[in-house]
Amino acid sequence: MKTLSQAQSKTSSQQFSFTGNSSANVIIGNQKLTINDVARVARNGTLVSLTNNTDILQGIQASCDYINNAVESGEPIYGVTSGFGGMANVAISREQASELQTNLVWFLKTGAGNKLPLADVRAAMLLRANSHMRGASGIRLELIKRMEIFLNAGVTPYVYEFGSIGASGDLVPLSYITGSLIGLDPSFKVDFNGKEMDAPTALRQLNLSPLTLLPKEGLAMMNGTSVMTGIAANCVYDTQILTAIAMGVHALDIQALNGTNQSFHPFIHNSKPHPGQLWAADQMISLLANSQLVRDELDGKHDYRDHELIQDRYSLRCLPQYLGPIVDGISQIAKQIEIEINSVTDNPLIDVDNQASYHGGNFLGQYVGMGMDHLRYYIGLLAKHLDVQIALLASPEFSNGLPPSLLGNRERKVNMGLKGLQICGNSIMPLLTFYGNSIADRFPTHAEQFNQNINSQGYTSATLARRSVDIFQNYVAIALMFGVQAVDLRTYKKTGHYDARACLSPATERLYSAVRHVVGQKPTSDRPYIWNDNEQGLDEHIARISADIAAGGVIVQAVQDILPCLH
């Protein structure tokens, strides 16, 4: 097994291992792909196979034949027998038709900034192949198969974070994939199972020869939304995981704050039956079931709480109403991204049944742009909610008797508890809400001679979403650390020992134990998670927890009961 290099990217949530496991191939061409399919290929190196369905393969060839006939007859078709964009009034001869496609790669090779994570580029190749298998693009099966070969061999072109306005698709990013697939020039670089090399060398190692693009093929490869959609699919997948973990954190916090389960009673939420609200309430009932730390008041009875409020504060009591629209929103985004995953997004499109071609705009990434704007907004709301819970836990005035800043050893007077950890979290949360600002509605770019005179900024929105997801991953790690320390301290207050496993609900005990395992601390009865400040570096714990989440490790496995509903 070889691990594909992440040297070109700082985004930890995009790590993946190339396993080459063929037992559950993802088939391209005869079935719709899901976000989970994209994650399997992009992250885990699951092998892909082009369908051998005869009708589909014949349709691909028929679209190529249509283009060839159009070139031979001189029929005016955009980007085939004409120039591009604002120069589409330039007629291209039969002799120049192939050169036009190769030149397209060259003049679009203008990317800048950091390299994209490998997993996002792998997702893009998968989606480009999936789009072309519809037989409406006029591209050879041989070129589509190159993407299958690259994916299965762990060969990933380097693509850059700047270059696309999401108008005519991801022209600049896809030029790097195209140039690498055909071995156009040594300046096109790839990652070959962790080793950087130029594209022609990679082709030789794969026993492949350089390809010359035929008419329409360059445009078909570069004129589409596959890169922004690949990034978006990975971001939605990550956000679903982080939402599930956040639900687990809230369940830990409710137990640590000695909260009630009454606020999640079905009677309340059936009276306001938004799907996300119903889901959140039902999940919280399950997450808190059989806990010894929660107030079990599902019978509708109420008890006075000494000097505390008779009902929980809003961040606990209104959890379903707050999280419900976020869950619904993420679900809607996922549906839109899956439609985009299974769409044909280049131009023109070829209708082989009616021997016609149509000039259109499926390359405009507006659904992706707006979807990723909304996803970042929802991530900011998720962080805001967790931040409020952390503030309750850290403040003895509101924590129902927990020590200030969740101090462990109060006899050591210099201990400050999780004060620094909260400050770090406070530095992250505003940034996440800032990233929640939209970009699809901003900065109109009257690009390319006013041909691309409206754009989606879908690619930029998606890359911002990637950044937001990676930052939120660190914030969730901090929230988990607060939750684990808090339930240890609540357990001590209730039982006289610190091992929260004895008191937690079974569902949250799994999450608690997973975090303890990841940070390398077994629970004990005589000490909570954090005892003295100088006995561990909490920055290392943040990094370990974040890395485990990124790798789909034991923390993610601990919330598997929640994930199917979100996926």
Swiss-Prot record:
Effect of L108G: Decreases catalytic rate
InterPro entries according to UniProt: Aromatic_Lyase, Fumarase/histidase_N, L-Aspartase-like, Phe/His_NH3-lyase_AS
2,3-didehydroalanine (Ser): residues bearing it: S168
Keywords annotated in UniProt: Cytoplasm, Lyase, Phenylalanine catabolism, Phenylpropanoid metabolism
Main location: cytoplasm
Subcellular location(s) of the protein: Cytoplasm
Positions of the catalytic residues: Y78
Disulfide bonds: none
Family matches, as Gene3D superfamilies: Fumarase/aspartase (Central domain) (1.20.200.10), Fumarase/aspartase (N-terminal domain) (1.10.275.10)
Effect caused by changing L108A: Slightly decreases catalytic rate
PROSITE patterns: PAL_HISTIDASE (PS00488)
EC number: 4.3.1.24
Reactions the enzyme catalyzes: L-phenylalanine = (E)-cinnamate + NH4(+)
SUPFAM superfamilies: L-aspartase-like
Family annotation (CDD domains): PAL-HAL
Record keyword Hydrolase present: no
A Pfam cross-reference name: Lyase_aromatic
Identification of the protein by name: Phenylalanine ammonia-lyase
Pathway in which the depicted protein is active: Phenylpropanoid metabolism; trans-cinnamate biosynthesis; trans-cinnamate from L-phenylalanine: step 1/1
PTM note: Contains an active site 4-methylidene-imidazol-5-one (MIO), which is formed autocatalytically by cyclization and dehydration of residues Ala-Ser-Gly.
GO BP annotations, alphabetical order: aromatic amino acid metabolic process; cinnamic acid biosynthetic process; L-phenylalanine catabolic process; phenylpropanoid biosynthetic process; protein homotetramerization
GO molecular function: phenylalanine ammonia-lyase activity
PANTHER family, per the entry: HISTIDINE AMMONIA-LYASE (PTHR10362)
